[in-house]
Structure formats: C-alpha cells, structure tokens
UniProtKB/Swiss-Prot annotation:
Pathway recorded for this protein: Purine metabolism; IMP biosynthesis via de novo pathway; 5-amino-1-(5-phospho-D-ribosyl)imidazole-4-carboxamide from 5-amino-1-(5-phospho-D-ribosyl)imidazole-4-carboxylate: step 1/2
Any matching Pfam family: SAICAR_synt
A GO biological-process term: 'de novo' IMP biosynthetic process
UniProt key word Ligase: yes
Gene name for this UniProt entry: purC
Annotated family: Belongs to the SAICAR synthetase family.
Keywords per UniProt: ATP-binding, Ligase, Nucleotide-binding, Purine biosynthesis
The protein's name: Phosphoribosylaminoimidazole-succinocarboxamide synthase
Reactions that this protein is recorded to catalyse: 5-amino-1-(5-phospho-D-ribosyl)imidazole-4-carboxylate + L-aspartate + ATP = (2S)-2-[5-amino-1-(5-phospho-beta-D-ribosyl)imidazole-4-carboxamido]succinate + ADP + phosphate + 2 H(+)
InterPro entries: SAICAR_synt/ADE2_N, SAICAR_synt_PurC, SAICAR_synth, SAICAR_synthetase, SAICAR_synthetase_CS
Superkingdom assignment: Bacteria
NCBIfam families: purC
Organism: Phenylobacterium zucineum (strain HLK1)
Amino acid sequence: MTRRKKIYEGKAKILYEGPEPGTLIQYFKDDTTAFDATKKAVLEGKGVINNRISEYIMTKLNSIGVQNHFIKRLNLREQLIREVEIIPLEVVCRNVAAGSLSKRFGLPEGQALPRSIIEFYLKDDKLHDPMVAEEHITAFNWASTQEIDDMMALTLRVNDFLTGLFSGVGITLVDFKIEFGRIWENDFSRIILADEISPDSCRLWDSQTNEKLDKDRFRRDLGNVIESYTEVARRLGIMKEMPTVIQGGLH
C-alpha cells in the first residue's frame, strides 16, 4: 500500500495529494470542534454523512452553473477535488438572526432578516476569525475588488439554491459559511466554490419546530448530533438510515 502525501490537515478534513496534477483527495474526519477548537469531540460517522451531503450539494450546484472544486466521491470518506488557491476568508450568508449576529446586534434568535446579509471573516483561529470589511480585504491583498464582487454574487446564488433545496424538505436555512479558491489558467484566475457544504457549515432548523439539525447541537450540548445530521441526509434522499459501524468500518 502506497503512503499518500498529506498536503494539509484542518479541524474536520485532511487534504492528500491527488492522482493527477491539479487534483487533491479530501478526507472527511469524525473530529468535531467549536469555539476555535477549544471544544473537541470525535463523533463516529460524522465524516461519512458530511461527505455524502457535500457531494450531493456540490453536484447540484455544478449542474446549475455554480462551479466548484468537487469532481467525484471516491468512497465513504473521500472525494476527489480540484486543487485551488484558497482565499483566506470565510464568507457567511445570513437569512435569520442567530449566533454571533444575534449577540452583536441584540436580535432575538429566529428573527427573519430584512434581506440576506453577507459577511467576511479572516480564516485565523489564533485571532478568532475576526470579521473584516472589504477595505481590509483589498488593502491586505487577500482578494481583489472584482474577486469580492464574484464571491458575493456566487454566495447569493448558492443561498438562493440552498434556501429552495432545504425548504422543499421542511428545513429552514438560517445561515451558512462557504469558502472560495482561485483556479489559474495561464496568467488569469477565476473564483470557484471550495471546501464543503454540510451541517457542519450551515445552520439548519426544522421548519415546523425550529429544532436544530446542525453543529449547534454540539456547540450547545443538545445531544443527538449524528442523528440530526442523518435526518438532514434522509430528508435530502441521500441516506435512509444512520450509518452503522461494522468491523471498524462505516456502512
């Protein structure tokens, strides 16, 4: 068995060298963190579920012209992706008041926002991922003005699609976080969607009860994290039941 070259390991995923130039293998871990990784746990099966959900959503987005790094799912925990030059920003789109937005502006959790709000955060755990303005982004050369415009336009397209997708299965898309990267073609680059879209990166509430079906169940010690992630997958028609552990492997 050939040992693969690890390119990068984050809190929830590992990137390995891909089989072809310009490709990577993205491995979904069961590790779960919150509050800048000060709270940690291993939730068996989470990586499998997130791999399937992200595959499903990225494939759907590709089909409507939202280009992203996903190529194909390889197995339960891995997918083949395009290698991109990651922009060091998290782009958050909010539809309903929750999390830090509620705290910053004194908004009751669950209050619908007048319109979708897009925020940018610098990817830096040591600095606690500070929110940044467009002036910071261009001044420090994290992205150009055109790239900011492209990211905002793509984020709104993703929001429109996800809102409809989840609404159709009785889930409210409260907010979500996405990342973007550059693809270079000769001397020109373009922005595409990267990372993942899953209950780790979205706030998802049951439309009838407002029950949380996302990572807030871990953040707030609500329990049943895997069951909630599985429920999202079940409603999307991806997985009919919770994955079971058989001889050390998830099936």
